């Protein structure tokens, strides 16, 4: 039986840190679903459709990644996708407490759903989509932190 994992997030936009995590996850699992949350309460810069398209382009080189948008409760989405592993990236100790709460709640809602925490490579450990957008808004160079297609889309949004 295939081991299916979900890597959820808002990915507004997807960064090289996210690509690092999903790439490493593809080496651990047969099928990785990059699940892009609608997250209307976060007021994303990119629409869900744009985020899905950008992520599909940025992960096209990874054969066992499927990019999908979702707005469901994570445990229900995982169950519907027949996934038993939830991948979460941890950048710093500060991320851990919140992620632990989410993991416990997801486990309560779906006991067979296991959370796996991956640390990004050192090079990406300090970046977030929010930080990249903030730097870009102030004309800072963010080319190193984003896939090329995402960088172009971000610059177009900010123009």
Curated annotation (Swiss-Prot):
Subcellular location: Cytoplasm
Pathway: Cofactor biosynthesis; coenzyme A biosynthesis; CoA from (R)-pantothenate: step 4/5
Entry superkingdom: Bacteria
Catalytic activities: (R)-4'-phosphopantetheine + ATP + H(+) = 3'-dephospho-CoA + diphosphate
Sequence positions that bind substrate: 10, 42, 74, 88
Cofactor(s) listed in the protein's UniProt record: Mg(2+)
Annotated PANTHER family: PHOSPHOPANTETHEINE ADENYLYLTRANSFERASE
HAMAP family in UniProt: PPAT_bact
Designated name of the protein: Phosphopantetheine adenylyltransferase
Originating species: Escherichia coli O45:K1 (strain S88 / ExPEC)
